[in-house]
Amino acid sequence: MEERLVSGYELTEDENEFSLRPRRLSEYIGQQKVKETISIFIEAAKKRNEALDHVLLFGPPGLGKTTLATIIANELGVDIKITSGPALERPGDLAAILTNLGEKDVLFIDEIHRLPRIVEEVLYSAMEDFALDIMLGKGPGARSLRLSLPKFTLIGATTRAGLLTSPLRDRFGMVHRLEFYSVEELMLIINRSAALLKTEITPEGSFEIAKRSRGTPRIANRLLKRVRDYAEVRSSGVINLENAKAALDLLEIDELGLDPTDRLILKTMIEKYQGGPVGIEAIAAAISEEVDTIEDVYEPFLLQIGFIKRTPRGRVVTKLAYDHLGIAYNKNAGELSLW
């Protein structure tokens, strides 16, 4: 899959984004309810001199789950170890990390829904009893050895909470969903990032970037950098409405943040399948893309803005999408054909 500017997933170019990330809860913009709840539990844990309870963060990619995990560790004044579900292939991989944690440290596992089952089962006793059960030997003579672990905090992150098993999900004391950001919140993030990048930006320029950022801070910061490049080369270096609009139009990111692939999906559904209902497999085949990629990368935002609907018979393009694309809406097709 090619790297998309408007993808919420981390791209190669985002590796240098750490300088823009907030380090304290007071600097973290948005997610007010989540932030307030976590702040209370952090203070309570510090007062009791205990490890924070385990935390599960879920929601679309790019909303700040990794950033929030790092902030939690900073607020607790402890170290954080960052890994991911796919990186923990064997129980030994997890054991090596757990045995090197300090008291009250944070272990952050991104994409926790992709943990191999055998590794997940080792995690149960670690989360609940702060212990590792290790099997010594094989066959009838095998015996179990319990190894004590420091009391740590596990923070799991996932974009697909529904794929977590019940035993794992039930072991998290705190479960928080991160929501898409408002345009106003994204403007605050863009203005903060512009200041850190030493780039001058007008309110109109900030608004233009924010409204095309799909409610996602990671995308907002990515687009800000691209618009900054355009402003420095084609203008005075100040990001205003004119050069923000010109830069984003050049990148083919429209007023709502849709890119060419988003529009291709919608037009394919309209032109080849009369707006639906159409199965996800048919859409994937028509645009030569994987089903999982469409479900994980493209579809969530189109659902969020109401451009497509999921129905028992398949996906349907709504009138909103027709209007946005400038295509005449056929009342005998699409969503109305369901009835």
Curated annotation (Swiss-Prot):
Top EC class of this enzyme: hydrolase
Residues reported in the UniProt entry to bind DNA: R310, R315
Region (Head domain (RuvB-H)): 255-339
Catalytic reaction list: ATP + H2O = ADP + phosphate + H(+)
GO MF terms, alphabetically ordered: ATP binding; ATP hydrolysis activity; four-way junction DNA binding; four-way junction helicase activity
Keywords: ATP-binding, Cytoplasm, DNA damage, DNA recombination, DNA repair, DNA-binding, Hydrolase, Nucleotide-binding
Binding site for ATP: L20, R21, G62, K65, T66, T67, E128, D129, F130, R171, Y181, R218
Residues covered by region (Small ATPAse domain (RuvB-S)): 182-252
Entry text on domains: Has 3 domains, the large (RuvB-L) and small ATPase (RuvB-S) domains and the C-terminal head (RuvB-H) domain. The head domain binds DNA, while the ATPase domains jointly bind ATP, ADP or are empty depending on the state of the subunit in the translocation cycle. During a single DNA translocation step the structure of each domain remains the same, but their relative positions change.
Family note: Belongs to the RuvB family.
Function per UniProt: The RuvA-RuvB-RuvC complex processes Holliday junction (HJ) DNA during genetic recombination and DNA repair, while the RuvA-RuvB complex plays an important role in the rescue of blocked DNA replication forks via replication fork reversal (RFR). RuvA specifically binds to HJ cruciform DNA, conferring on it an open structure. The RuvB hexamer acts as an ATP-dependent pump, pulling dsDNA into and through the RuvAB complex. RuvB forms 2 homohexamers on either side of HJ DNA bound by 1 or 2 RuvA tetramers; 4 subunits per hexamer contact DNA at a time.
Protein name per the record: Holliday junction branch migration complex subunit RuvB
Gene: ruvB
